Amino acid sequence: MDEDKGIDSKESGEYEDDFEKDLEWLINDKEKSNGSMIEVACKKEDDLDQELKEKETETELGPQLSDPDKPPKDEALPRRNDFISVPSIQPLDPISDSDSENSFQDSKPENQKDLEDEEDEEVRRYIMEKIIEANKLLQTQEPVNDKRERKLKFKDKLVDLEVPPLEDSDTCKVLLENETNMSGKLSQLCISGDLGQESMLMSVTNGGCEENDRKILVERDGKFELMNLQDIESQGFLPPISSANGMEHESSQLPLRSANLSVGGIKKEEPEAKIHIMTLSQAGEPLAQVPQPPANPKNRPSSAANPDLNKKTRRSSHRIQSAGVSPVTSTYCLSPRQKELQKQLERKRERLKREEEQRKLEEENEKKKENEMVFKAWLQKKREQVVEMRRVQRAKQIEDMSSRQVNRDPQQAFRLWLKKKHEEQMKERKTEELRKQEECLFFLRGTEGRERAFRQWLRRKQIEKIAEQQAVKERARQLRLEARRSKQLQSGLYSVPEAKAFRFTDHYN
């Protein structure tokens, strides 16, 4: 697991370095392209002139041919966008070339040499023209924008959380010593039983040690404990193990099923296997016994296989153990400062959560207020609409009444008025009768009271009769007046057109 992480971090670091180097190289080349390419062209011209002179001298003296088109070392390095490919001629071996050239120059005519010189000059001119064109293209190119956002980004730190080393060096040393001692003891003897989630690792000490010091490292539910060997035997986890003072040359083979548990770098074992327990002689020296393979090769434990083939499985087992614990809940491996930072983060989260809840409550209250205001505005608008409708209805009723008064018939109006008056009189009569009954009940206490009440009643009757007669007379009088008025109006309407018809009018005088 660690090796994979190291390889991944190394590859990502190399990729990042290459990416940054390419960017820096592009930027530097773009900045230096304007001035450097002109200087390179000038240097090429000088080099070409020198090579021509050297070639002329060599042809006279007969030395070996030199390569006139060989570029300098500085420009031989490949580049990506600013690279200019120049055709080059491979140099020949100096010893073999000198002999072959001398023999070839003797047979070659002078005209052929002149043609080759002209071809070389044409090649040089073509190369120079290409270089000048490339320089012009580089000068016309736009500079690279350094402020643009990169598509590929990398973190400053590949690991978000780093656990600092232990501050106490003494404790580290003690832990390392304990681990080395324990690993040495575990290499002597390893007994594992399938008893739930418990695994026991036993180490047998030398013969000089006392029996009280013999302890076994026991794992129970992920916790390690040092327990006495006698306690383990009394609990029935292990058979009694012979000590230095016990029987000589005695070995016991126990077929046990190994549980799927591991401590440190010990591999989990699933199949059953026979574990040989080393015994001690009287002198305290252990008898060396070579472990024998099991009878059934199919049930061979996985630890007996090739370690190179089991690397992936071992890595996966470590991964399974380490991935079972959450880094948030397990604070035993954090420093005090990291714990304090974690507490601060938790406080910050709680504070943000409270602020979010408070903000939500405020938003809800604001929404309620807005809804109430909108409802009040809607209610006020409805009330105004109702008032306006009532006012319009009242205006319509007044208009209808006025139109009825203008166009009504007088006889129909009189009949309506008479009916209304009759209803009012009937109501008055009922009220009067009720009042009289009350008075009669009040005065009926003797003969004198009865006579007095009778006289009062007779008087009221006479008054009512007189009032009715007067009302009838008044009504008859009004009817006569209305009839007379109607007759006068009708006679006036008929008389006016008759008079106008027989009258002469002179419009010119």
UniProtKB/Swiss-Prot annotation:
One GO molecular-function entry: microtubule binding
Bias-annotated ranges (Polar residues): 319-333
Keyword Coiled coil found: yes
Keyword list, A-Z: Cell projection, Cilium, Coiled coil, Cytoplasm, Cytoskeleton, Flagellum, Microtubule
CC per GO annotation: cytoplasm; manchette; microtubule; sperm flagellum
Region (Disordered): 27-122, 287-368
InterPro entries linked to this entry: CCDC181
Source domain of life: Eukaryota
Coiled coil: 335-377, 418-488
Localization of this protein: Cytoplasm, Cytoskeleton; Cell projection, Cilium, Flagellum
Stretches with biased composition (Basic and acidic residues): 41-58, 67-82, 337-368
Disulphide bridges: none
Family: Belongs to the CCDC181 family.
Purpose of the protein: Microtubule-binding protein that localizes to the microtubular manchette of elongating spermatids.
Assembly mode: Homodimer. Interacts with HOOK1. Interacts with HOOK2. Interacts with HOOK3.
The protein's name in its UniProt record: Coiled-coil domain-containing protein 181
